[in-house]
Amino acid sequence: MAEEKELVLLDFWVSPFGQRCRIAMAEKGLEFEYREEDLGNKSDLLLRSNPVHRKIPVLLHAGRPVSESLVILQYLDDAFPGTPHLLPPANSGDADAAYARATARFWADYVDRKLYDCGSRLWRLKGEPQAAAGREMAEILRTLEAELGDREFFGGGGGGRLGFVDVALVPFTAWFYSYERCGGFSVEEVAPRLAAWARRCGRIDSVVKHLPSPEKVYDFVGVLKKKYGVE
């Protein structure tokens, strides 16, 4: 496909938001060019492409920028309809499909609003505030586990494969070890089915290729702590 060569992702290696875009394109079989950004010295291309938020990830498709990772995932479904869907296909007048799409969007938004926010506080805080954030994270993971239920994947696109919520959430599994170390809990103990889901995802080629090791992420968290004077 000629369009595949026109995809460029402006990204940063440890960003879960960029990783979800990379995984989505890999799942769809789309070729893309990865361009690592120096977030301390952002490129002119990034600043021109996302002048409102001035942040990664940005997907350039034939030179046209698309910003915000969940928007990018939905754009990929729309722009490449012949590839595996992340969201259930939209069928005019099909209330069940509309509900499934809305539900997937809700849980992806939950990941961004709750899990990401709490995870950021976990490494920034100390003492009892950090312990409280650890308890909050454990409850967030239990909530996600309840939504997963007995399914193999959260799904969305069908066919027993990664769907919209899976792709939105799976990059954060590389941060689970850091959450455990900072929060004083075990993901396996508080949400064993979610931990099993993470292991299943971790055997999928697109995830293996585009997620860093938990240890490398934890080393990065240590750098952040020093940078912000947490330690």
Swiss-Prot record:
List residues of the GST C-terminal domain: 97-220
What chemistry does it catalyse, as a reaction equation? RX + glutathione = an S-substituted glutathione + a halide anion + H(+)
- Gene Ontology BP term (one): glutathione metabolic process
Q: Which domain of life is it from?
A: Eukaryota
Tell me if Heme is a UniProt keyword of this record: no
Which SUPFAM superfamilies does the entry mention? GST C-terminal domain-like, Thioredoxin-like
Pfam families assigned to the protein according to its UniProt record, in alphabetical order: GST_C_2, GST_N_3
Which InterPro entries does the UniProt entry name for this protein? Answer: Glutathione-S-Trfase_C-like (IPR010987), Glutathione-S-Trfase_C_sf (IPR036282), Glutathione_S-Trfase (IPR040079), Glutathione_S-Trfase_N (IPR004045), GST_C_Tau (IPR045074), Omega/Tau-like (IPR045073), Thioredoxin-like_sf (IPR036249)
Entry keywords, A to Z: Transferase
Q: Where does glutathione bind?
A: S15, K42, I56, E68, S69
Q: Which residue ranges does the record assign to the GST N-terminal domain? A: 5-84
GO MF annotation terms: glutathione transferase activity
Main enzyme class: transferase
- E.C. number: 2.5.1.18
Q: What does this protein do?
A: Conjugation of reduced glutathione to a wide number of exogenous and endogenous hydrophobic electrophiles.
Please give the family membership noted in the entry: Belongs to the GST superfamily. Tau family.
Which PANTHER family does the record cross-reference, listed alphabetically? GLUTATHIONE S-TRANSFERASE GSTU1-RELATED, GLUTATHIONE S-TRANSFERASE, GST, SUPERFAMILY, GST DOMAIN CONTAINING
Q: What is this protein called?
A: Probable glutathione S-transferase GSTU1
Provenance organism: Oryza sativa subsp. japonica (Rice)
